[in-house]
A protein has these predicted regions:
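N-terminal Rossmann-like dinucleotide/flavin-binding domain of flavoprotein oxidoreductases
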Residues: 1-44, 162-188, 226
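Rossmann-like dinucleotide/flavin-binding elements
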Residues: 29-40, 50-66, 72-165, 205-307
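Pocket-edge structural micro-motifs
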Residues: 186, 202, 283
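Short polybasic amphipathic segments
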Residues: 196-201
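Residue-level signal for pocket-adjacent positions within structured domains
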Residues: 5, 71-72, 77, 185
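Short, exposed beta-strand/loop patches in secreted or surface proteins that constitute
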Residues: 189-193
Length: 307
């Protein structure tokens, strides 16, 4: 996370935790997989499973081959492989998934600063902030830096992209990717990845028009007439059917596809054994969906207070 633009503060947070652990003489052992049963056999009275998450891999043709490097001219990477620099992106990148991770990855691709913070002058220029006292509101025309790559973001839902982002900071992420000229496509069905790029289908009708129709039907009126319950259900099913059937194919000639399609918990064997009241699962290992660092930290603090 600390390599994502705007999140460099994680570096200092991690250093603080490491220093605290060293000061408390905590023994940290790495490079070996263990199970709760093995730790119980060694005499540990309480066991905390905080093993985090792994990227969820979608299932459609070309994903597995791409991850294994078997597609000529196209790199397929998980978000973890990308941000850790295990795999290097090209010049034209498709980001599959538009949740919080998808937006972080898009910003990383547009503004890859190799983990160094953005300078104040660069930030001021990007957002149009000026120090001249004679400028109204100290704001002028934003002058964002030239994006380092061409990025297209895709999501399956037909809803407006970025709706699930945080209420206080979501607008910043949406504005940042917009400044980078990111193309955004919603209502996508992923068909395959091959040497030509990413193959998808999209609705023929603008998803925003479809959503407007659905909203009207659910309100009980449509095209000037009042609907009863049966008519509403029939129209909603018709709209859904037409959306699935009336689609067009599209090939996006990207050289890189990044998978930001959710996460799944990592749990060692036996972590959920029945009757093991001294085995505690927290953080991403507990619930991977919409993983929230604040929630994970709260779970850890509350558990530590109990034991």
């Amino acid at each position: 996370a600390m390599r994502v633009p705007g999140k460099q503060a994680f570096v200092q947070a991690l250093y603080a935790v490491v220093n605290r652990l060293e000061g408390l003489k905590v023994n940290i052992s790495t490079g070996k997989a263990v199970t709760p049963r093995e730790l119980q056999d060694e005499g540990f009275e309480e066991i905390v499973v905080a093993t985090g998450v792994r990227p969820r891999i979608p299932e459609f043709p070309g994903v597995t081959e791409g991850l294994e490097g078997k597609i000529d001219g196209v790199t397929v990477a998980t978000y973890a492989e990308l941000i850790s620099c295990e795999k290097t992106p090209g010049e034209y990148v498709a980001v599959i998934g538009a949740g919080g991770i998808g937006y972080d990855v898009a910003e990383f691709l547009l503004e890859d600063r190799q983990g160094t913070p953005q300078t104040l002058n660069s930030w001021n220029s990007q957002w149009g902030v000026v120090e001249a006292s004679d400028v109204h509101g100290n704001l002028s025309t934003p002058k964002p830096e030239r994006p380092q790559r061409r990025v297209v973001m895709l999501q399956r839902k037909p809803t407006r992209m970025g709706r699930s982002l945080g209420k206080t900071t979501g607008w910043v992420h949406r504005a940042t990717v917009a400044m980078g000229g990111t193309e955004q496509i919603v209502g996508v069905t992923y068909e395959k990845i091959d040497s030509e790029g990413l193959h998808i289908t999209v609705p023929v009708e603008d998803p925003q028009v479809t959503l407007k129709k659905i909203k009207q039907v659910k309100s009980g009126t449509f095209e000037g007439r009042t609907l009863d319950r049966a008519e509403k259900q029939e129209l909603l099913e018709q709209i859904e059917r037409e959306t699935k059937e009336n689609r067009e194919q599209r090939v996006i000639n990207v050289d890189t596809v990044v998978l930001c399609t959710g996460q799944e918990s990592i749990r060692p064997e036996g972590a959920e054994q029945e009757g093991a009241s001294n085995v505690h699962i927290i953080g991403g290992a507990d619930v991977a969906a919409e993983l929230d660092a604040k929630r994970a930290i709260r779970q850890a603090v509350e558990l530590a207070a109990r034991i």
